[in-house]
Amino acid sequence: MIEYVQAGTIQVAKVLYEFVNEELLPNSGLDQDKFWSDFAALIADLTPRNKELLARRDEIQEKLNEWYKEHRGRFDFHEYKAFLTDIGYLEPEVEDFEITTDNVDEEIAVQAGPQLVVPLTNARYALNAANARWGSLYDALYGTDAISEEDGAERGSSYNPVRGAKVIAYGRQFLDEAVPLVEHSHKDAVQYAIVDGKLVVTTEGGATTGLKEPEKLIGFQGEPQNPTAVLLKNNGLHIEIQIDREHPVGKTDKAGIKDIVLEAAVTTIMDGEDSVAAVDAEDKVVVYRNLFGLIKGDLTATFEKNGKRLTRTLNPDREYKTPDGGELVLPGRSLMFVRNVGHLMTNNAILDANGEEVYEGIIDAVVTSLIMKHSLIGNTRYLNSRKGSIYIVKPKMHGSAEVAFANELFDRVEDMLGLERNTIKIGVMDEERRTSLNLKNCIYEVRDRIVFINTGFLDRTGDEIHTSMEAGPMRRKNDMKSSTWLAGYEKSNVAVGLAAGFRGRAQIGKGMWAMPDLMAEMLKQKGAQLKAGANTAWVPSPTAATLHALHYHQVNVAAVQNELANDRNDYRDDILQIPVVDNPQWTADEIQEELDNNCQSILGYVVRWIDQGIGCSKVPDIHNIGLMEDRATLRISSQILANWLHHGICTKEQVLETFKRMAKVVDEQNAGDPNYRPMAPNYDDSVAFQAACDLVFLGYEQPNGYTEPILHRRRQEAKAKFAAVQQ
């Protein structure tokens, strides 16, 4: 049972109450009693509006369901659009405008670069992500399939000089492309020196040359004639050539280069939403405490690796001498956003005056802003924002009224915490259909505080399926990627953002590369997101961030956005194309293949979520390829099966049989995990297995197809069950 403390009209879980009072409020400039009374007032004032917005979601869904049923077999696009306008689903568009957000850090407004998303429940992962601002290109190439293992270049258990030579050659080729020399190639270099404020490169034949664009030299470490590091800059991102002739790699390199370090994850989203399993007060405090440790700069994580005990901490800033003899300090860490939850869920961390759980998004807004305030008032080892801003990502909003509510919430939090108006900046996830179609209006509601919009294919597909559940059977999951609506959605996000003045002011982001082991493929494909106008895109690991950084050297994002700025196309008719299959011709084998893939994916993710509280993990798919799974991937998998079930493409018995068969596969895939609880053969006794079934068999009724209500309920059940067994 959770122990509560009465704080005015609200009851606060003791674990949260003590954390806030003992750790967050000291040195915050806030009075404890006033903080809690203001919090209670905010809850009382904003809860009714939150409820209204959720009721509006349900009302719209009911109207959609009825319309689709009535028009099945006689769908008329113009009639459909008129209906969506009548019910307020399609909003009248606001006049043209430009955002006016100010005090935005360069990492968001100016620098284009990779963005990491990492669960706040895992301190080690969070530290790794924060430190992924800089990454070793040599390590990223050597340790992944980015460099092939052909011709004796296997990775192996010890250093392979053949592979090392391939890595070095790749690095030199990169330097030739990003920071070319006037004559010769970086491959010919035997020495790098700083002479009269310029980079002088000596080649094997004794000739000297310099940079084709001398201004790309930014700084160095060590002595000018014999630097230990040379700092260059291309397309807004830094490149550090590290030189050490005594180092095992430097010894083998004719110029003594031991590594090329790239500025990589310029920004990171510290996630308290889709990648975490936080279902109660205790879990929420873990999330908040790790965020506070990151902001203060004193978070540590100790772990064992290869038999050694290691402690991870935040990296310090990086110091250089400038070519003209000055000093330069660059951040050693990624600029941090925090992702709050959306408007849907409540949490038992606080009970309101009626004894009801408070909306989790309201709790998140207050507590995470209080945490990040400490960075603004000098209470932390490092600055997060150099511009005095707090960055919050707000997900899963449907239409502009919900974005306006987030704005009102942030206004109230600023007043409560003594922050100037628009100190709290918002990143709006464009991952629900009603937001995609009304994106201009959504941005308008937060035009003074918005710093990012981002497309999320997976959640957005989940909403696509659930919205039009009654329209008919939907395309197979992999076929969704070639849908008309999806191409329109991706183009529209960029076009609307650029038209609203995002260039040089805010991020336009694109989605996750979900296969952390397939880096060669990522290098081939992910550059397309930048060519489409994004100035940031999501990556699953620090290594992926380092490799994705290469794309930003190949593509000048600012130039791409300048070209695309004239795109005034309206993509909404494309976005409205429903991915329904009118006369499905799938064979029995194809249907079973889709069931196998989705059931295995659901079980592989849900079993860790429910039994171990792991909200984001690399889950092997049915072909044993590791895929990064979070609640967004779960939403699409569960909704596609719920849709097929509803339209008779498959039967409940078929799905249940598939779940049972796939449970054995997932059990086998997790056999090496000592904390794993098998689902087979006692399916009725496995809360995780039951949760997976619920997600599909109750998928039709779930609000907007969200997975959180079932996951939270079942995780709480599992926690209680495991605790009872331990007693």
Curated annotation (Swiss-Prot):
Question: Could you tell me the Gene Ontology terms of the biological process aspect for this record?
Answer: glyoxylate catabolic process; glyoxylate cycle; tricarboxylic acid cycle
Pathway this chain belongs to: Carbohydrate metabolism; glyoxylate cycle; (S)-malate from isocitrate: step 2/2
Binding positions for Mg(2+) per the UniProt entry = E431, D459
Instruction: Indicate where the modification Cysteine sulfenic acid (-SOH) is found in the sequence.
Output: C616
Say which enzyme class the record assigns: transferase
Q: Where is the active site?
A: R339 (proton acceptor), D630 (proton donor)
Q: Name one GO molecular function term.
A: malate synthase activity
Query: Matching CDD domains, A to Z?
Result: malate_synt_G
- List the EC numbers from the record: 2.3.3.9
Under catalytic activity, the entry for this protein gives: glyoxylate + acetyl-CoA + H2O = (S)-malate + CoA + H(+)
* Principal location class: cytoplasm
Q: Which cofactor does it need?
A: Mg(2+)
Q: Does the keyword Cytoplasm apply?
A: yes
Q: Mind giving the lineage of the organism this protein is from?
A: Bacteria, Bacillati, Bacillota, Bacilli, Bacillales
What this protein is called in its record is Malate synthase G
Q: What does this protein do?
A: Involved in the glycolate utilization. Catalyzes the condensation and subsequent hydrolysis of acetyl-coenzyme A (acetyl-CoA) and glyoxylate to form malate and CoA.
The organism encoding this protein is Geobacillus thermodenitrificans (strain NG80-2)
Localization annotation: Cytoplasm
